[in-house]
Amino acid sequence: RQAITNWNRTSFEGSLPGAVCVGKAGKAPFGDLVERPIPQWKNSGLLSYVSVRESLKGDTLFCRLPYNAQITPYLKVEAEAGKTIHIRMDNYEGGSERNVRAEYITREGEQEYESYGWMNGHEVYYIIPEGVKVLDVKYRETGYNTDLAGSFHCDDPFYDELWQRSARTLYITMRDSYMDCPDRERAQWWGDEVNELGEAFYALSPSGQKLAVKG
């Protein structure tokens, strides 16, 4: 709530401290720079949720996504200063430990916030305290830049749906590397990658193969 607002917009009329050079490319603290071997992330822009419903007490918004996605949640509110809004996913307690969540402390008046620490799941929970009026909620889907290009069809609906779910599972475990799972173990594991890279040839557009080459 003490942050300088709109400093990154051309309409900003305030003043900022002078820029400081902390290091040159190829030198400390950065080290050698290398060309990124995979595409930049896919970015959907801000999107409306499939549906939004309130809890019985009216203190929580349950915002449905179209599928299990990697997203950054957004809100626009009018609030008193010092109110804490909690944001988490339905996958927050999906493993052995609680995982990714966000908090936003309000300032006085109308304001917007997007939590850039990405999280994933099927539904976003906004827990809203008294003294906060919600004006809008949205989400931004980001992820590895490839398309679900493969297809499968048979006379059994079970296997058709299994294909769709498997392709979505493959995609949700991709970002800067293949990962065990996107909600708690985001490190690359070769055991998982071996399975996933084999699926990528059948399910994804060619750009998906670059993640396996990166290793």
PLM ranges: what are they?
Residues 1-183, 191-192, 207-213:
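Extracellular/oxidizing-compartment recognition motifs
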Residues 195-206:
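Well-ordered alpha-helical scaffold segments within catalytic/enzyme domains
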